Amino acid sequence: GPYKNLRWMPTGGVNAKNLMDYLSFDKIIACGGTWMVKADLIEEGNWDEITRLTREAVTNMLGFTVKHIGINAANEDEALKAAKTFEALFGMACAVGNSSIFSGDKEIEIMKKPGRGTHGHIAIGTNTLDRAIAHLKLRGVAFDETSRTEKNGRTTLIYLTDEICGFAVHLVQK
């Protein structure tokens, strides 16, 4: 079409249930809607409810979930031993990769040598990584830009600068 370089911000017909349908389209930059800021809430001055609804929309849009926990092992033998322990105790089959061994449905990643983080890392998945980065930056979170990986012009992985309790944290696109 004639407007292939434009990005849009729909506001009509958007609600909490279809928000992600809109945002999944790459031509949509943002969404708005009266479901977050209803006229009666404004008239009542119910700013707490407006704030709650808006935060709920942002939380749903970002959809943060734990994707996996990474554990730093000293070496490949220790990593394999740990993976076999998860398999024996919990039935989590292990899959050996080049730099790590995954257990279960990739919920646990055991590094074959110490990696990022004092103890390891935590991968947090999000529905929309570039929006998550922008949101967290506004909240004062710093990112290690040297860790950013991209595919087709979109970020697929990035580490936060600071560890949390000895764990590096990285965001990944779901």
Residue ranges and their predicted role:
Residues G70-E109, R131-A134, L138, E150-N152, ...:
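Core segments of cupin and vicinal oxygen chelate
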Residues V58-A83, G117-I124:
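N-terminal beta-strand motif that seeds the catalytic metal site of vicinal oxygen chelate
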Residues G1-L6, T51-M61:
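Alpha-helix-loop-beta-strand connector modules within alpha/beta enzyme cores
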Residues G1-K4, V14-I29:
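Catalytic cores of alpha/beta
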Residues L6-G12, I29-G33, I69, I122:
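Hydrophobic faces of well-ordered beta-strands that scaffold small-molecule active sites
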Residues T51-R52, I108-K112, K137-K174:
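Vicinal oxygen chelate
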Residues D21-Y22, E56, H135:
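Well-formed, non-transmembrane alpha-helical positions, independent of function
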Residues K27-I50:
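Glycine-rich phosphate-binding active-site loops on the catalytic face of alpha/beta enzymes
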